[in-house]
Regions:
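Short N-terminal helix/helix-N-cap motif within the alpha/beta-hydrolase-1
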Residues: 71, 115-119
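A conserved beta-strand element that flanks and buttresses the S-adenosyl-L-methionine
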Residues: 106
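C-terminal alpha-helical "lid/dimerization" subdomain adjacent to the S-adenosyl-L-methionine
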Residues: 15-21, 135-195
């Protein structure tokens, strides 16, 4: 789903860049036990600011950054001019990559834009290696409830009827085989509450020793953590 004019302005604004680098990245880095990734995928890369931060703070050997909007990809290519980074126009719910292609996948607020978000999560699980990390900052229908959430609804073009709640999102991650490593709620500048999450695909060795697997891991978090 492409951005309307207001959203396009916001994601390309200094405010968005400031929030990403000063709030989201430090929190996500603290949530990761390891920051060494060889091959990274960023979905919904937009103008490339998130890609630039991944390069700066994680320095993977190679980054593949995708976006559905060709206009955003052209902007991103100007933002990050590096031979170790490849930008592609691609739908995050139908990824054109082989199974187990990436050590880490980053998402800075794109999945809530996708009506068929479960397909997207399934694809992320497919292309992430065993032992790989899903690192994300996301919004949910909870963001757009109450005030000022309902005001945002009148201004932002999102698939609200299909949008997940925070709890539903976490439970679906576990259903398809992710293990939740860490979860935090965030609301920098007190303007738009969202959540930060790190999940992993258990390695084969871990799967053999932990037969309880992902089904019961949600119990480690209180339901209030997701609201």
């Amino acid at each position: 789903m492409k951005l309307n004019n207001l959203e396009f302005f916001f994601v390309n604004s200094p405010i968005r860049a400031y929030i990403q680098e000063r709030y989201e990245l430090p929190l996500l880095m603290n949530m990761l036990t390891s920051k060494a990734f060889d091959s990274v995928l960023e979905i919904g890369c937009g103008n490339g600011n998130g890609t630039k931060l991944i390069k700066k703070y994680f320095n993977p050997i190679h980054i593949t950054a995708i976006d559905l909007d060709e206009k955003m990809i052209q902007i991103a290519k100007r933002t990050v001019q590096d031979e170790t980074t490849a930008f592609k126009v691609m739908d995050s719910s139908t990824l054109d990559f082989p199974n187990e292609s990436f050590d880490a996948i980053f998402d800075f607020g794109i999945i809530h834009h996708i009506p068929n978000w479960k397909d997207c999560i399934g694809e992320l699980r497919r292309v992430l290696k065993n032992g790989g990390k899903l690192v994300l900052a996301e919004f949910s229908i909870d963001t757009f409830s109450g005030f000022p959430g309902r005001l945002y609804r009148s201004m932002l073009s999102h698939p609200y009827e299909q949008m997940f709640s925070t709890e539903e999102f976490v439970q679906y991650l576990e259903r398809v085989g992710f293990k939740i490593d860490d979860f935090k709620k965030s609301n920098p500048l007190k303007i738009m509450p969202h959540f930060l999450l790190v999940a992993s695909v258990p390695s084969k060795a871990h799967e053999k020793t932990d037969t309880a697997g992902t089904e019961n891991h949600t119990a480690d978090f209180q339901h209030s953590d997701f609201r």
